[in-house]
């Protein structure tokens, strides 16, 4: 099997996982500016093809939103795939180095906090879900 075809299947599956969970995919700089400057809270899932993204981060992204409090907006950028959109999103994450997979929580276009790769790798999907839900409890409104 051609490696590029295999990797495209992996990328397509990773995109599908997160968009089927209800996250809006941002593919351009304009998409990012429009989405991240909205009023309210926004969770950005920085997706990737690594094992901890598929085994931990994406399941946590899916499970965490079934909670009394959650962000107003759910969006995703794909590191290594949609580079311009990812780079643009990272300009909003002031004070945090590039990290993927990761989660950024913003309010009214300003970064509140992040769950970085080192907060994901080596943890279970349930542990990362709990980290996200703790942030939602602190910063989000009840739905």
UniProtKB/Swiss-Prot annotation:
GO annotation (BP), single: cell redox homeostasis
Pfam families given in the database record: Disulph_isomer (PF06491)
Family classification: Belongs to the bacilliredoxin family.
NCBIfam families hit by this protein: YphP_YqiW (TIGR04191)
Protein's UniProt name: Bacilliredoxin OB1863
Organism name: Oceanobacillus iheyensis (strain DSM 14371 / CIP 107618 / JCM 11309 / KCTC 3954 / HTE831)
């Amino acid at each position: 099997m051609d490696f590029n075809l295999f990797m495209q299947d992996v990328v397509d599956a990773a995109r599908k996982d997160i968009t089927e969970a209800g996250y809006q995919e941002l593919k351009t700089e304009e998409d990012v500016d429009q989405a991240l400057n909205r009023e309210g809270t926004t969770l950005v899932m920085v997706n990737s093809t690594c094992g901890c993204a598929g085994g931990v981060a994406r399941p946590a992204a899916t499970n965490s939103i079934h909670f009394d409090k959650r962000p107003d907006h759910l969006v995703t950028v794909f590191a290594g795939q949609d580079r311009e959109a990812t780079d643009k999103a990272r300009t909003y994450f002031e004070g945090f180095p590039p990290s993927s997979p990761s989660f950024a929580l913003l309010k009214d276009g300003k970064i509140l906090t992040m769950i970085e790769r080192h907060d994901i790798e080596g943890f279970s999907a349930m542990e990362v879900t709990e980290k996200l839900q703790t942030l939602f409890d602190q910063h989000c409104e009840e739905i």
